[in-house]
Amino acid sequence: MTRIEPSSRRAFVTGLTGFTGRYMAQRLEAAGYEVWGTTAPGAPLPDDPALANCTLLPVDLLDADALRAAAADARPDAVVHLAARAHVAQDDPAQTYQVNIVGTRNLLAAAAGIDRRPSAVLLASSANVYGNATPGVLDETVAPAPANDYAVSKLAMEYAAKLWHDRLPIVIARPFNYTGVGQSEAYLLPKLVAHYARNEPRISLGNLGVSRDFSDVRDVTAAYLRLIEAAPAGETFNVCSERAYSLKEVLAMLSRIAGYVIDVTVDPRFVRDNEVKSLSGSRARLRRAVGELPVTPLDETLRWMVDTMRGMQAAHA
């Protein structure tokens, strides 16, 4: 394995201003990296302390020339690809395929064109590639069976990356569901947390029977950093907690944290026919490659989210 030496520390992160990117920036800086990264052109720059020391470059992943120039300027030792059309329920599949496949190819071409070879290129895929056909604990040997456009685009991205394995030390991460402070309420757990933090009496949800392997975003970025530094090129790794929680268990945790029970209504508009029914992962391969990693209990993550949101509400009251 090729390891990045402490004397040479610069990382280039796509999607740096996104939910995961901000935590990745903190993780990289704490490890001694100078952080460069992309943000969507025209988007307002966030006033976020996590990004205060970062070099932000407004670049569209579909603009191959601009991406090539940005990568050449950064000359990174490590590349972390987080930018994507990331929500399963996105209603523009053409854009999802463009960004997640063509955008990734543009990044790999840009990275391969840098005058010094990066020591690691981490691509964030998704455990959604496993689909909903295989019950139980999923490891990386399970045949992919994507059940929606987002998952198909991520699997196609993985296959596209194989074309660059002879030129770049590519590592693919398949994160299962994860959450934390700052994630959009378009996702399930932040939606639930927001309702409880606001003391709302009721909530409308979709499929109550789903089970998910939930991680804390801080644990996910810790795993990404370990993979960058170990650089096991050509391999694919689940990033997960190895524990699946039902929606009922999550609601019970939030009820204990918030101090009341919310009234739940199942709204057919939120029920997706192709919903992945159960996702639980094995991280045995990850453990062998990088050693033990932290696993934050889900109730601690939820409490962090509820307390933070309530604190923000009190500050603006």
Placement of each model-derived feature along the sequence:
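Rossmann-fold cofactor-recognition segment
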Residues: 50-63
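NAD(P)-dependent short-chain dehydrogenase/reductase
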Residues: 135-136, 159-213, 217-226, 251-257
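Active-site helix of classical SDR
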Residues: 153-156
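C-terminal substrate-binding subdomain of Rossmann-fold SDR/epimerase-dehydratase oxidoreductases
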Residues: 198-317
